[in-house]
Amino acid sequence: HVDVLLSPRTERDVIEVQAEIARAISGSDTIRLIDVADPDALDTALVTETAQPAHDTLLPLGTRRQVARLAGKTLQPEAKVIDLPDAAPYGAVLVDTDACTLCLSCVSLCPSGALGDNPDLPQLRFQEDACLQCGLCANVCPEDAITLKPQLNLTAQAFTQVVLHEEEPFACIECGSLFGVKSTVEKITEKLAGKHAMFASSEAAKMIQMCDNCRINAQYHAQNNPLAGKERPRVRTSEDYFSKRKDH
């Protein structure tokens, strides 16, 4: 049983949220907030029946997150996943695979490294134990495909990277190297080919389906190459000068 005495200057909202999280992890209502200003009423509030220990005494070791997991596994040994209230710093990330385009904006902004990618394949990976439920990934997602689920996963799966979403990569039409996401490249081709000034011709539209190296090579040899300068003048040789001499 835990009693927390609040001082007049204590921020109630923060303490109440933390107490609610602790109740959820412990699986009981043994945490009580005492918000009493009258000394006589305080004496009455503190004189309560002493509760029996919920578990044998143990020595918690590790970080705060590790201690929280230890408390959950000790107080709720049968539980695998404990649902937590909103604003809890533990939880999972849910991805709408139909909306996700694997742009990986969430990966670049994840402060704890809970979200990751695969350098070889279009994949979005997630490690639940590292997630802080900060909400940056959900806010930055341009497709609104990410939602947060506050929970405490007590299984070993929380320490492993799981694939939340993956798709087939696109093969370059010139060299065959894999790049990007197949569905995204096909969607961009459908929207731009023949409908945008830069991709009006079929040859220009093919550049969308090329890797970065092949795209530069194709653009360099195109007739309307924007990088091309003026035609170089012909090199003058001694024959040009001899041809202008009258005695030649």
Spans of features found by a protein language model:
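Accessory beta->alpha helical hairpin/"wing" motif in late/C-terminal subdomains of nucleic-acid enzymes
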Residues: 125-127
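Short, charged/polar low-complexity linear motifs in solvent-exposed/disordered segments
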Residues: 142-143, 239
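Charged, low-complexity interaction segments
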Residues: 1, 201-248
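Ferredoxin-type iron-sulfur electron-transfer modules and their immediate structural context
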Residues: 6-17, 23-120, 130, 140, ...
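Beta-sheet entry/capping signal
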Residues: 1-3, 92, 123, 226
